């Protein structure tokens, strides 16, 4: 969905978003009730203070002397009521914070759990920065709006109705002056809120786009600098940044008009009460103290309209962000596991029967693929870029489901076994290394958290990683920066290999496993892999054909089909597509 489309949610969609927000609040109904009760106490105390002040004023006016004793009694009452109001306001803040940040926590937890169930196709087609923006920035903005809503909306509405009752009790005509003029604030606020909402929605969307772009630029900064594309990167950022500025200015323009417009109406109300009240006071209809009460109430009555108009604007922004979070939560999950899904007990036998797959409906990638892999065989998959090698690995791991045919492991269709048991049967070394922020020891033990130090050390030695690990500042307790930023690419690859060495699952998938390791290290790693692969079904994906010469079977893929199959010597003797790939690689090395 484009940013423009996102910014045009219909009123029905906004109502649906609000309903879902209320559903998220429902588990915290106890705190909502407490908040309402405490807000009522706080408002009642605040509204009682003007009455006490009016009484004190009347006690100081008149033909006789000032009633100092009476004034002191009133002052003591004012202090007590003010303390009660302050304490109630503090409790209100505690309750509202509990509601807001609990809902925010629940939303983030739900979003992260959702990401765990999303199909790989969703993650491949959505920028990671945008997903992060929804989980972090959008939830934060939503929390700010929700907190303001709870803090000011409850007390504001209670203040409006409370002051209205007190004013009606004191003088109906003056009250009518207030009631007739004040609703103009709501008309103005409603008009501006409708126009600011779509811009806040657009702002949230463009902010997510900007986060994705910044994330991409930071991760690829070395490549950008190597190719001298700094200017192009700045231009791309300036374009997104400019759009964010434009939509933000429009959103702020309409939202910032709300406060002065409502204050203008409030000042008219205050002046009207002062004039009409003065006439009544001169005529003897009310006392000076009562006029003071009305002026205070007029201010307190109109102030919530001003605050609520600001709250409405913030809630519009909060709803816009909530809609983006709910859009993530509503994304279609990966195909659920079968109700009677089995735990896979594999013997290493893998069979593909008439497998077909496509990323796009009109563009088939793999068609009619048949393959029978015996237990313990080493299967090398080679071919030009885009022929389907990595896709085949994704299908074996069930990151994607086949569109036709079936994949069986140990005679079981992988759609009938649990994903956890299927993926736990494979050890993977991917082309793109991934390390978590933690120690070297924790990264090696990622697949086996209960591993002993002896097992971790043995795995590192088997992967030829022990020597470089010991040279690190704190050895195995060295903390690795985000995505391994403080070690080399080759060292990251060695740690990923050690991670697999520790688990030793029955099947292996090696996707360009040694593409970032120097030749000397590669020889050592190949020897370690040879020992590790003994008796284990292994799938090897590589562009460097020299790394798969020892494979039992080489599958040569082209346009989603296996065009040749055999061992290295057989395929070279055929002089076919594999021979051309092999010879062209070494011709390139020689030149």
Stretches with model-predicted labels:
Residues 337, 343-591:
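ABC-type nucleotide-binding domain
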Residues 32-88, 168-173, 284-288:
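Transmembrane helix-loop-helix hairpins at lipid-water interfaces of multipass membrane proteins
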Residues 2-11, 101, 109-133, 137-139, ...:
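Short intracellular "coupling" helices and adjacent cytoplasmic loop segments at the cytosolic face
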Residues 229, 253, 270, 300-328:
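Cytosolic ends of transmembrane helices, especially the final helix of ABC transmembrane type-1 domains
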Residues 48-50, 54, 81-84, 149-193, ...:
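A hydrophobic transmembrane-helix motif
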Residues 27, 120-121, 137-146, 150, ...:
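An intracellular "coupling" helix at the cytosolic face of ABC transporter transmembrane type-1 domains
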Residues 1-46, 61-75, 92-96, 100, ...:
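Membrane-integrated ABC transporters
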